[in-house]
Amino acid sequence: MRRCLALGVLLSLLAVPVRGAEGQPYAALTFDDGPSGKYTQRLLDGLAYRGVACTFLLCGYRMEQYPELTQRIYQEGHEIGYHGFSHDSMKTMSRRRIGQELMDSQALLPQGCRPVFFRPPGGVVTDGVHQVAKARNLALLSWSVDPRDWALRDRQAVKQAVLDQVRDGDIILLHDMSASSVDAALDIVDVLHSRGFQLVTVSQLAKLRKTPVTPGEIYTRFPPPEDN
């Protein structure tokens, strides 16, 4: 019952177009490598309760493993982007294989889901990655805040690393692969809300900042006009 009420609140909020208020700070939480079973479920429950939408960069092999979670992410109003199929490094990968990784992932997307962003594993952008992304009409998504949650595995340390750095327009890199990361992410949401931040998807952040998203371009953050 509680989850249904929380989901209803989230969907009602997402049904209203996001409009920027003067002086309102924004940030986008992004989650790599999932979905991951119980940790993604826990994260989605917490986000729904708080009425927050995020951007998930999903691995194809995990979408194949967790189709119901992939569907839930999309149905609950979160943005989905590509993170490759295998999560193998693309540093020396051929353009043909990079394209195949994206095609194999695309086949597993929920009906109607059309990703705008591609974040290669490790954020490594080679000429091949750039060319394939541009050809497939995808922008490349980087980040501006990285607490290295996958390495720290400490809820408080991850939370503090983000809160010490975050600024208006930042894209925050996290992973929904462990309890410490998920719990830190929800703590971060609560503190940023208390600081007046609104948390949105990356696509929403780009629109709020009136920044066109161009295929093949790399996006690290979307700062307010006065920071440009």
Where do the language-model regions lie?
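Divalent metal-coordination and catalytic microenvironments
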Residues: 32, 47, 80, 118-121, ...
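C-terminal domain-boundary segment and adjacent tail
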Residues: 21, 49-50, 63-64, 180-228
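Alpha-helical scaffold elements lining the catalytic groove of polysaccharide deacetylases
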Residues: 39-42, 88-113, 122-168, 181-184
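Residue-level detector of anion-binding/catalytic polar loops
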Residues: 53, 79, 139, 146, ...
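Positively charged n-region of N-terminal signal peptides that target proteins for export
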Residues: 1-3
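Active-site beta->alpha N-cap acidic-glycine motif
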Residues: 18-97, 101-108, 114-115, 207
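Bacterial N-terminal signal peptides
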Residues: 6-15
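A cross-domain feature marking catalytic cores of carbohydrate-active enzymes
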Residues: 31, 58-61, 82-84, 120-122, ...
